A protein has these predicted regions:
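The feature encodes the CheY-like receiver
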Residues: 62, 88
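Conserved acidic carboxylate
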Residues: 10
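Acidic, metal-coordinating helix/loop segments flanking the phosphotransfer/catalytic sites
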Residues: 20, 34-54
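C-terminal output helix
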Residues: 90, 108-118
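Hydrophobic/aromatic residues positioned on beta-strands within the core alpha/beta folds
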Residues: 83-84
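Short amphipathic alpha-helix used as the core "switch/output" element in two-component signaling
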Residues: 65-78
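Two-component/phosphorelay signaling modules centered on CheY-like receiver
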Residues: 13-33
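Active-site residues of response regulator receiver
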Residues: 57-58
Length: 136
């Protein structure tokens, strides 16, 4: 099985390090790419050579908010999981309305997070499995 290409969009360095460690220890083969803000995420995603299987997106980002990234890529057939510290019902509903497949609130149990990511991939498939061309 080829590794899942996951783009993690997270401005908190501690959370990004933890996610890299958790994904590295999971049973899923993963290649994790990290963007530190919304602008960097949009730049990475504008590269036609890069097509992630999943985007894990924080909403509270510097430069360009996660909601803008979410709205821009909702039609790209890439599953997007919002992983945010927001507990605001309106913000959660807006993220789901904009196309997030799942909203996971921080902090969360690590195993629950891994199970959620696995479940999303199983339920929605990867862009490649859904007929979207993938680079490489």
């Amino acid at each position: 099985m080829k590794p899942l290409e996951i783009l993690l969009v997270e401005d908190n360095a501690g959370d990004a390090v933890l996610m890299r460690q958790v994904m590295g220890e999971s049973k899923i083969p993963v290649k994790l790419h990290i963007a530190r803000d919304g602008e960097q995420a949009l730049n990475i995603l504008s590269d036609a050579e890069f097509r992630p299987d999943l985007i894990i997106l924080d909403l509270n980002l510097p430069r360009i908010p996660g909601s803008v990234v979410l709205e821009r890529f909702k039609s790209e057939n890439i599953p997007i999981v919002v992983f945010s510290s927001s507990w605001n019902d309106a913000e959660i509903q807006n993220a789901l309305k904009l196309g997030a497949r799942e909203f996971i609130q921080k902090p969360t149990d690590i195993q629950e997070f891994i199970d959620a990511v696995c479940g999303i991939i199983q339920k929605w498939g990867t862009p490649e499995e859904n007929g979207v061309a993938s680079a490489g």
